Each structure stands twice: as structure tokens, then as C-alpha cells.
């Protein structure tokens, strides 16, 4: 096992400010492809600062509910904001399970190989599930968690 623990960080709502595009998934029909295509988000200073601080003594792993087909766009965004761009774990394109389940599954696999020092996520349901599973978790509370984003994560399995 490597000596440095992992810092596992969500993207949307932690380092990327998605508020400007939430209207695309608020009403029906939900415009998911446009929502993801417009992911030229402003960075969230609190999240970016935390990631840079954690990178001093942790290996950063990104764990996002964004679908795999948005990998290049997400990696480009991370690079533009001078954040580590790999490893980046993403939701399989056709996996619409709640974020709390997909993230728990991915984290259990990571935990088999490395110590997980901290997980940072903005979704209270994800935080509760991971805490119950014994992961050290910090709720990213620098933005109020949106009910639109919560529905996307829980009911639609999209972010």
C-alpha cells in the first residue's frame, strides 16, 4: 500500500460552481446533454483551496457523478484551473443509480488498495452513506446544496 492516503474529491458543488446551469435540469424535459456540455463552471475558491491544501500530503482522486462521456470536458476543466486531472473516476454512461450508491461502490474498491484519508462531497445523502460505511467525510458546505442537484443525484442518477 502507498504511504500517502487518498483525498477523494467530488467535482460539482465542491470545486465547480454549477449554479449557472441548474435551470437546464429544473423543468421537464430535462436537458441533460446541454447541462453537461455547459460545464465551463467558475471554480469555487473554498473547494480549490482545500484540494491544494490536501494535495500536500494526500494523493488526490476525483470521484464525480458526471457520466463517462464527459471525461475530456472534465479533465480539461481541471487542467484549466490548475488542479490535478487524474485519476478521475466517473459514472458509467448508462448507470442511473443514486450518487450515494455509485460513490460508495467506487470508494470501497479504492479502500481495498489504499487508505482513504478524506472524502469531500457536497451531497448530504452521499456524506451520510459514506459516514455510515466508515469513511472520513467532509461536507462541502460553501454553497447551499440545491434541491435540483439533489434530485439529479438521487432520483435521476445523473451527477
For each predicted feature, which ranges?
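Short, low-complexity, polar/charged sequence segments that are solvent-exposed and flexible
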Residues: 27-28, 79-83, 107, 138-139, ...
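Glycine-rich phosphate-binding loop signature in dinucleotide/nucleotide-binding domains
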Residues: 2, 57, 110-116
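Short loop-to-alpha-helix "cap/lid" segments that border enzyme active sites
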Residues: 98-111
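A short, conserved beta-to-alpha structural element at the edge of catalytic cores
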Residues: 35-41, 144-159
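Alpha-helical substrate-recognition element adjacent to the catalytic core
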Residues: 2-97
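Short low-complexity, flexible loop/linker segments enriched in glycine and/or proline
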Residues: 77, 102-103, 152-156
Amino acid at each position: 500500500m502507498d504511504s500517502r492516503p487518498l483525498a477523494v474529491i467530488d467535482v460539482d458543488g465542491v470545486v465547480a460552481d454549477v449554479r449557472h446551469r441548474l435551470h437546464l435540469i429544473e423543468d421537464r424535459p430535462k436537458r441533460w446533454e446541454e447541462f453537461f456540455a455547459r460545464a465551463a463552471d467558475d471554480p469555487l475558491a473554498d473547494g480549490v483551496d482545500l484540494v491544494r491544501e490536501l494535495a500536500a500530503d494526500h494523493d488526490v482522486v476525483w470521484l464525480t457523478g458526471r457520466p463517462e462521456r464527459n471525461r475530456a470536458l472534465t479533465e480539461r476543466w481541471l487542467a484549466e484551473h490548475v488542479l490535478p486531472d487524474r485519476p478521475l473516476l466517473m459514472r458509467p454512461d448508462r448507470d442511473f443509480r443514486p450518487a450515494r450508491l455509485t460513490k460508495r461502490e467506487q470508494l470501497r474498491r479504492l479502500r481495498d488498495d489504499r487508505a482513504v484519508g478524506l472524502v469531500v462531497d457536497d451531497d448530504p445523502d452521499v456524506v451520510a452513506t459514506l459516514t455510515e460505511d466508515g469513511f472520513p467525510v467532509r461536507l462541502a458546505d460553501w454553497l447551499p446544496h440545491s434541491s435540483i442537484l439533489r434530485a439529479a443525484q438521487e432520483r435521476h442518477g445523473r451527477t
